[in-house]
Amino acid sequence: TVPTHMEEGEYDAEILPYKYTAHVTVDGRPLNLYAKVKTKFELQTWNATHRIQVGASWTYAKNLGDGQVYDLSRPLNPGSSYTRPRKYSDIPASEQIALFVEDQIGIPIGKHHLEVQAGIGSSMLLNLNSRYALSGKPYFDPRINAQWSFPAIGIGNNDLNINVSGGFGWLTKTPTLAQLYPNKLYMDFVQLNYWNANPDYKRMNLRTYIVDPVNYNLKAARNFKWEVRLGMEFHRNDFSITYFRERMSSGFRSMAN
């Protein structure tokens, strides 16, 4: 038997035949839009050269398809009744705006050279219901990287170049559409199960409850990372060693009730 209803209430289940042929069509019609603007300019302050980038981007993703289309009375997997078909077009679009500014600074210090790259990015999800904790909330991801290059050391006919670098920064990951808009759960409880050798007398009656697992309190996952690196270059051979540490104290996962 399989349920064929889409609403809460009491219904008779469909009695499946011993053999049947199931057909399914997956209708997906994705629409993806992307726009980006970026500008670069340079300026000089004392003996430092600044290469500055400023930009913004906008992304939009929507599926206009019908999703899985099949006869509910002839399912591919009759043992799976917790979900029902859902149109892709019923899922709201994913829309995000992002801004960034970055300054790459080059500073000669005697025969040494210091390169600093500092920037901050900001992103925010759009098209969210006001009940979501993420609605209208921007996240900021600052980051800094620096590299100190020492004077070249002559060894034979080649130079040994040594540099030390390090950096730290934040990275924000927002929930996916599947996490923001999960499928509803259908809880079908058998109220009556009468089995008879005569198919005309067989009957199963169900009481169905629908659970909406949407979590409006979802927040973005934040990841902090820092690293230090020693690099060497000699006669077209590169060697480097890096130590890094990454810490993420938040994230997403599915939990069964």
Residue ranges of predicted features:
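Polar low-complexity intrinsically disordered regions
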Residues: T1, V37, Q44-A48, I144-A146, ...
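Face-selective signature of the C-terminal outer-membrane beta-barrel domain
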Residues: T1-R131
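Structural signature of Gram-negative outer-membrane beta-barrels, strongest in the C-terminal barrel
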Residues: P30-N32, S57-T59, D90-D238, T242-R247
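Short aromatic-enriched loop/helix-cap "lid" or pocket-rim segments at secondary-structure transitions
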Residues: G67, L177-L180, F252-S254
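Short secondary-structure boundary/capping segments
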Residues: D71, L180-L185, A256-N257
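A generic membrane alpha-helix/interface feature
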Residues: S73-N77, L185-M187, R253
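Surface-exposed, extracytoplasmic segments of Gram-negative outer-membrane nutrient-acquisition systems
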Residues: R247-N257
